[in-house]
Amino acid sequence: MKLVLASNNRGKLAELQAMLAPLGVQLIPQAELGVGEAEEPFHTFVENALAKARFASAHTGLPALADDAGLCVQAFGGQPGVQTAYYATQFGYDKGDANNVRALLEQMQGIDDRRAAMVSTLVAVRSPQDPEPLIAVGRVAGEIARAPRGTGGFGFDPVMVLPAFGKTFAELPPEVKNAHSHRGRSSRQMLELMREHWFAGTSER
């Protein structure tokens, strides 16, 4: 089954393709089909993910999967939230993972409450008008490190510490990260939702 991924983020593509492999799903980045980025005007992950999935499906005629994910910092009242990808631009930096990490650490200087959560909301639709979108939410709580650690992953992985391991996501092997990450959790939920709603009574492939 071909499924359009409403994202051009290579990190997301690799993680989601690996986690949905048991279904025989082939994820195709929307850019490969000539689809641009959808607007994300909403204040919640689920609304933005649904908008992106519908947009990708409408422009390709294929089922679509969208992921809206972000970092929610306790000391910032849950921000940057849906603005996570553009966090650095608020402080005069160009958009990008390294600048996001730099800006976050600068803004958290002198803050002792390092609690934060990474949230991934996956939405899948069979068509733009699908009345029953599949929605899966994964959340993992941790703490923001005081300096980047590790070389793996992407986004805020170098500063998101998982207390159970005492390591950042970027310090963990990919298979360990995927087993415990927010996207890993939402992907496992989505896998079961697709099996139940889309592939029930079929051989899945």
Swiss-Prot record:
Superkingdom of origin organism: Bacteria
Cofactor: Mg(2+)
Gene Ontology terms: cellular component: cytosol
EC number of the protein: 3.6.1.66
Residues bound to substrate: 7-12, 69, 154-157, 177, 182-183
Disulfide bonds: none
Residue sites binding Mg(2+) per the record: 39, 68
A Pfam family annotated for this UniProt entry: Ham1p_like
Molecular-function GO terms, alphabetical: dITP diphosphatase activity; ITP diphosphatase activity; metal ion binding; nucleotide binding; ribonucleoside triphosphate phosphatase activity; XTP diphosphatase activity
Residues at the active site: 68
Entry's Gene Ontology BP terms: nucleotide metabolic process; purine nucleoside triphosphate catabolic process
Record text on cofactor binding: Binds 1 Mg(2+) ion per subunit.
Class of this enzyme: hydrolase
Catalytic reaction annotation: XTP + H2O = XMP + diphosphate + H(+); dITP + H2O = dIMP + diphosphate + H(+); ITP + H2O = IMP + diphosphate + H(+)
Subunit structure: Homodimer.
Family to which the UniProt record says this protein belongs: Belongs to the HAM1 NTPase family.
Function recorded in the entry: Pyrophosphatase that catalyzes the hydrolysis of nucleoside triphosphates to their monophosphate derivatives, with a high preference for the non-canonical purine nucleotides XTP (xanthosine triphosphate), dITP (deoxyinosine triphosphate) and ITP. Seems to function as a house-cleaning enzyme that removes non-canonical purine nucleotides from the nucleotide pool, thus preventing their incorporation into DNA/RNA and avoiding chromosomal lesions.
Stated name of the protein: dITP/XTP pyrophosphatase
Annotated organism of origin: Acidovorax ebreus (strain TPSY)
